[in-house]
Amino acid sequence: MDFELEPTLESIIHQDSLKWIFVGGKGGVGKTTTSSSVAVQLALAYPNDEFLLISTDPAHNLSDAFCQKFGKDARKVEGLSNLSCMEIDPDAAMSDLQTQAQQYNNDPNDPLKSMMSDMTGSIPGIDEALSFMEVLKHIKNQRAADDGSESNAIQYKTIIFDTAPTGHTLRFLQLPATLEKLLAKFKDLSGKFGPMLNMLGGGTNQQQDIFSKMNEIQKSVSEVNEQFTNPDMTTFICVCISEFLSLYETERMIQELMSYNMDVNSIVVNQLLFAEEDDCKRCQSRWKMQKKYLDQMGELYEDYHLVKMPLLGSEIRGVNNLKKFSKFLLKPYDPKVDKALVFELEEAK
């Protein structure tokens, strides 16, 4: 390319049309800190709009990052009133689903109900499925707002996902396309076998309810699929550290995301030492290795926003510390000017 893209996330923060932002990468590279920082900057940039940060990682860290307890329902961040957070809880969600299912079947001794209760907690991919249900819920609220329907639900300008490590995230992002195909097949089969089931007797109204619900879900899933593959509405921010394994996994993830037609044009590189003028030999040696992989990333991702974030002297916890750290997503870190901040973070309460 003849020009280098800005090494910041400014284009994402100020892209007014974005509805969904995914933040993902290998385990332990700083996804939660990055997603929290993105959410904080969005909330600061648009003080009159509401934002939601959702953790889809089974091992949640949002409560630790903000020093505030979050759960399965969206809760406002203390000190940032237009940002809410929630952590997907599979156990609580499955309990809610079973309660809803009782309206169709009140028999407590039903072996099928008992079997489903035992199975759901251990189904592979249940976290991804529940996260997707949360997406469907917000799509429904979005549609109600567009139609002018009355809704008590908060309308979020943008929803940010603090995702699980790469494999879980890729499974989650495959769900819309896979579900759309499955529901189309189901619709086709129900058209063929529906009359036969009616002839066998009973359950006509219940069948109509089920088919109506399936049509509604199919419409929402198609809408999700459409929005997730629209670069004006959805983008993915890759997070990594400057090491071989992380770089390798980032490349694999980008190739996979491109195969889903998902927009990805930003990479955040965390935990950089910037140790040119440091007397510590270990730091200099580590920085030399980091620079080698940074150079490779610069060549490999010249048409990406490559954001370089420093390793700080203490943990980045609490809204005030996140505000300080997240500024470097918009203004590149300069070790000569900003070095003092590395050791200036407040002690998390």
From Swiss-Prot:
User: Where, by residue number, does ATP bind?
Assistant: K26, G27, G28, V29, G30, K31, T32, T33, E243, N270
SUPFAM superfamilies in the record: P-loop containing nucleoside triphosphate hydrolases
Q: Name one GO cellular component term.
A: Golgi apparatus
Q: Name one GO molecular function term.
A: metal ion binding
Query: Which keywords has UniProt assigned to this entry?
Result: ATP-binding, Cytoplasm, Endoplasmic reticulum, Golgi apparatus, Hydrolase, Metal-binding, Nucleotide-binding, Transport, Zinc
A Pfam family per the record: ArsA_ATPase
**Xref: InterPro entries:** Anion-transp_ATPase-like_dom, ATPase_ArsA/GET3, ATPase_ArsA/GET3_euk, P-loop_NTPase
Gene Ontology terms: biological process = tail-anchored membrane protein insertion into ER membrane
> Where in the cell is the protein located?
Cytoplasm; Endoplasmic reticulum; Golgi apparatus
Coiled coil (UniProt feature): none
The intrachain disulfides are none
Active-site residues (renumbered): D57
What's the Enzyme Commission number for this chain? Answer: 3.6.-.-
Specify which residues bind Zn(2+) according to the UniProt entry for this protein: C280, C283
Q: How does it assemble?
A: Homodimer. Component of the Golgi to ER traffic (GET) complex, which is composed of GET1, GET2 and GET3. Within the complex, GET1 and GET2 form a heterotetramer which is stabilized by phosphatidylinositol binding and which binds to the GET3 homodimer. Interacts with the chloride channel protein GEF1.
Q: What does this protein do?
A: ATPase required for the post-translational delivery of tail-anchored (TA) proteins to the endoplasmic reticulum. Recognizes and selectively binds the transmembrane domain of TA proteins in the cytosol. This complex then targets to the endoplasmic reticulum by membrane-bound receptors GET1 and GET2, where the tail-anchored protein is released for insertion. This process is regulated by ATP binding and hydrolysis. ATP binding drives the homodimer towards the closed dimer state, facilitating recognition of newly synthesized TA membrane proteins. ATP hydrolysis is required for insertion.
What family does this chain come from, according to its entry?
A: Belongs to the arsA ATPase family.
Give the protein name, as stated in the record.
ATPase GET3
Q: Which organism is it from?
A: Clavispora lusitaniae (strain ATCC 42720) (Yeast)
